[in-house]
């Protein structure tokens, strides 16, 4: 009873704090509040509080159930939210790049934890005895590596999607185009002295507009480079986690079912996801290929991760069906 109450309190604390963090962060985007009362630092500290809250929640379920809390979809979602909070803390200690990652980790954490605690998962929030297939020492190794891999790959893929949005956004002032048309009309209406004054004024405005354009494009270029840099680093880390998770799962499957690979739906989609991100890393090693191509591949990988993670849970079939929406 005590563990259940403690778990309930920690769940609501972590969800409430991450909700406040998200509101604060979007307020700092709309209004420069961080210079007034330091709201942005408060949001970073809020994520740290969320991290310890989710950690306490996982430890409570571990002690209460007697097994590592990764036996169903609810627990895996909480663990995934915990993984996003870890990524956020890494960005917190790296002050130069924290803003870009915060825009990804905070909304992701609140969305995942909100879905996990929304009541859509039937009886999954209640701890239960492990099914025989999960009673193995490989549970912690395999599932934790897969979830950490999902978290890192999702974060890196979202950065790639942001890169694509910024890249394909139409940028470039049309001031000089309008200015040319205006000068043609003025030449027909005014004398030389008046035109000289107007042209001088327009030249100053045009130069200011060009300087602003160069400044904006330079910032845009720097932002694209940073997004590409961090996307590659985080996806590389997630790819390592995913590889270790798949290999440990193969060893576990051989011990349980006598075969390393059974082409289960979850296994098949995990292999497809692994292949897509292997292609992404291969593209990144080729300097002749533009970064936008790798970002497109990472965006495809983002969709595949959700298919792999939720696809089997929606269908409720295969060797991994014990974590489905319909299981009790």
From Swiss-Prot:
Membrane spanning stretches: 13-33, 46-66, 73-93, 101-121, 146-166, 234-254, 263-283, 295-315
Entry GO CC: chloroplast thylakoid membrane; plasma membrane
Listed GO biological process terms: cytochrome complex assembly
Bilayer topology term: Multi-pass membrane protein
Subcellular location, record wording: Plastid, Chloroplast thylakoid membrane
UniProtKB keywords: Chloroplast, Cytochrome c-type biogenesis, Membrane, Plastid, Thylakoid, Transmembrane, Transmembrane helix
InterPro entries: Cyt_c_assembly, Cyt_c_biogenesis_CcsA, Cyt_c_biogenesis_CcsA/CcmC
Pfam families in alphabetical order: Cytochrom_C_asm
One GO molecular-function entry: heme binding
Domain of life according to the entry: Eukaryota
Entry function: Required during biogenesis of c-type cytochromes (cytochrome c6 and cytochrome f) at the step of heme attachment.
Family to which the UniProt record says this protein belongs: Belongs to the CcmF/CycK/Ccl1/NrfE/CcsA family.
SUBUNIT field: May interact with Ccs1.
Protein name listed in UniProt: Cytochrome c biogenesis protein CcsA
Gene transcribed to yield this protein: ccsA
């Amino acid at each position: 009873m005590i563990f259940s109450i403690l778990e309930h309190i920690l769940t609501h604390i972590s969800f409430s704090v991450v909700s406040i963090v998200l509101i604060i962060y979007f307020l700092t985007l709309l209004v420069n509040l961080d210079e007034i009362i330091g709201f942005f630092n408060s949001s970073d500290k809020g994520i740290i509080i969320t991290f310890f809250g989710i950690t306490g929640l996982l430890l409570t379920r571990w002690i209460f159930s007697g097994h590592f809390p990764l036996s169903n979809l609810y627990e895996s979602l909480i663990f995934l939210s915990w993984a996003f909070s870890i990524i956020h803390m890494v960005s917190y200690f790296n002050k130069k790049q924290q803003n870009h990652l915060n825009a990804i980790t905070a909304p992701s954490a609140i969305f995942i934890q909100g879905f996990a605690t929304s009541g859509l998962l039937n009886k999954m929030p209640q701890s239960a005895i492990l099914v025989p297939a999960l009673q193995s020492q490989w549970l912690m190794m395999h599932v934790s590596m897969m979830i950490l891999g999902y978290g890192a790959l999702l974060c890196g893929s979202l950065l790639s999607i942001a890169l694509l949005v910024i890249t394909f956004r139409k940028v470039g002032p049309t001031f000089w185009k309008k200015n040319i048309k205006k000068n043609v009309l003025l030449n027909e209406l005014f004398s030389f002295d008046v035109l000289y004054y107007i042209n001088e004024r327009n030249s100053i405005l045009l130069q200011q507009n060009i300087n602003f354009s160069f400044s904006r494009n330079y910032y845009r270029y720097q932002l694209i480079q940073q997004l590409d840099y961090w996307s590659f680093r985080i996806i590389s880390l997630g790819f390592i986690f995913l590889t270790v998770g798949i290999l440990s799962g193969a060893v576990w499957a051989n011990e349980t079912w006598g075969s390393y690979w059974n082409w289960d739906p979850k296994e098949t989609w995990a292999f497809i996801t692994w292949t897509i991100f292997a292609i992404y890393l291969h593209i990144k090693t080729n300097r002749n290929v533009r970064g936008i191509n790798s970002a497109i591949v990472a965006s495809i990988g983002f969709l595949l991760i959700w298919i792999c993670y939720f696809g089997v849970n929606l269908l409720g079939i295969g060797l991994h069906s014990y974590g489905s929406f319909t299981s009790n």
